[in-house]
Amino acid sequence: MTKYALVGDVGGTNARLALCDIASGEISQAKTYSGLDYPSLEAVIRVYLEEHKVEVKDGCIAIACPITGDWVAMTNHTWAFSIAEMKKNLGFSHLEIINDFTAVSMAIPMLKKEHLIQFGGAEPVEGKPIAVYGAGTGLGVAHLVHVDKRWVSLPGEGGHVDFAPNSEEEAIILEILRAEIGHVSAERVLSGPGLVNLYRAIVKADNRLPENLKPKDITERALADSCTDCRRALSLFCVIMGRFGGNLALNLGTFGGVFIAGGIVPRFLEFFKASGFRAAFEDKGRFKEYVHDIPVYLIVHDNAGLLGSGAHLRQTLGHIL
């Protein structure tokens, strides 16, 4: 067996590749490539392997799209490929293609305390189910359970469940967005584009015309307190994040913790801490006490997707995490 495996974390914009020490799980030599610069994922992998001059026979790539069979077509990119064909072309003995939040969930057992920031709740209960979700280009969701000394990730497309408002303001947001786009999923409000949707709906609810803002613009104006609409949008984003996380906690009794990943929340960490997130997380009526002690953590590891891809592959190859 070779010392290293190839691991990857591929989103709608970038492909991040690295080497994973098969024995220890340590990630090294990570490099990010723009997806727009390459015709295929295989082309990116070939460039990476050529640059690093290392023999690799095993690989695991996490991708931001559903993985339901051999054919993979990315949701937010034009890349599409056959897993079996790419494995053959690269000369790999083993190639795993997994959902990006499967990878993030598999990273959780590998994380240390310094990789986490806690938002309320008590200590996690060992051996109990775990939920992980995160907003970025879209909204990713997965669960993690421990069975027979193995970690089992339960991937899905939970980001596309219905947006479920629980206040008058949220109901108005739903009404406006439904008139524009039809079905309003949670991802339509909990993502970068979702933050824009919240801003636009807030402005339109007041019979005004919204500006053509990007997620970055809304966040910057909200933090600078220079735009009331942007601040309202960001505050509402935090509240809906809390409601959604609380729903995940109820679904599977995640007393092992609820973990937040994705690139959006760390950009306004202090704002998030002071927001209505935790109150919304616990706002479950008769089941408020049920979720009260469930801890929520923000993952602040720079390469959680790569770490989890490596963990998934190592476990598949017979290692105990």
Curated annotation (Swiss-Prot):
Matching Pfam families: Glucokinase
PANTHER family: GLUCOKINASE
Keywords: ATP-binding, Cytoplasm, Glycolysis, Kinase, Nucleotide-binding, Transferase
Molecular function (Gene Ontology), one example: ATP binding
SUPFAM superfamilies given in the database record: Actin-like ATPase domain
EC number, UniProt record: 2.7.1.2
Reactions this protein catalyses: D-glucose + ATP = D-glucose 6-phosphate + ADP + H(+)
Localization, UniProt: Cytoplasm
Binding site for ATP: G8, D9, V10, G11, G12, T13
Protein name: Glucokinase
Gene Ontology annotations for the cellular component aspect, listed alphabetically: cytosol
Family under the similarity heading: Belongs to the bacterial glucokinase family.
Cytoplasm among keywords: yes
Main location: cytoplasm
GO BP: glycolytic process
NCBIfam families in the record: glk (TIGR00749), PRK00292.1-1 (NF001414), PRK00292.1-3 (NF001416)
UniProt source species: Shigella dysenteriae serotype 1 (strain Sd197)
